[in-house]
């Protein structure tokens, strides 16, 4: 039987809607003033491994596969997660980000970014000089955030 030493930290003034699921075997750190929509999943692990030579055998039922973490999840301060967002193992979301409804975050979202889609892609960044959310050039081919 595997042993885990999970570390879960939720900052002050977090606002969570209904059906928010936070699962942790390694580490989940959530900053202050999170606004979290309905049906959000934040997890630092998966049932099995799906890359490389140690990938899980599909003949083994998912519930019997070992829990595997690709790394802790870190969510900064003043972040808004829209309804249905999934934040997966190893994801880092910087301060002041907005993650659009049903986005899947698998990598790093820089501070002050609006990201949408699956996988999450940056579409706007906050400009302190202009005090506005500016489109990212070539947003139609928005960079994949990894």
Question: What name fits each language-model region?
Answer:
Residues 1-89, 118, 126-127:
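Flexible, glycine/small-residue-enriched loop-and-beta-strand segment within the central core
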Residues 76-81, 99, 133, 143-145:
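Hydrophobic transmembrane signal anchors and adjacent membrane-proximal interface regions, especially
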Residues 83-123, 128-134:
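C-terminal/domain-terminus segments
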Residues 58-64, 113, 122, 131, ...:
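A generic alpha-helix propensity feature with a strong bias for hydrophobic helices
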Residues 46-49, 97, 140:
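Intrinsic disorder/low-complexity detector
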Residues 126, 136-145:
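S-adenosyl-L-methionine-dependent methyltransferase catalytic module, highlighting the catalytic core
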């Amino acid at each position: 039987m595997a042993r885990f030493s999970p570390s879960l930290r939720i900052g002050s003034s977090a606002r969570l809607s209904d059906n928010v699921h936070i699962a942790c075997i390694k580490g989940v750190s959530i900053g202050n003033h999170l606004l979290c929509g309905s049906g959000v999943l934040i997890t630092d692990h998966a049932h099995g491994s799906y890359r490389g030579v140690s990938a899980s055998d599909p003949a083994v039922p998912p519930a019997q596969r070992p829990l595997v973490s690709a790394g802790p999840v870190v969510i900064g301060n003043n972040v808004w997660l829209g309804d249905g967002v999934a934040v997966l193992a190893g994801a880092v979301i910087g301060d002041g980000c907005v993650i659009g409804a049903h986005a899947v975050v698998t990598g790093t979202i820089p501070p002050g970014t609006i990201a949408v889609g699956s996988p999450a892609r940056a579409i706007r960044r906050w400009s302190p000089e202009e005090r506005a959310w500016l489109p990212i050039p070539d947003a139609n081919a928005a960079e994949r955030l990894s």
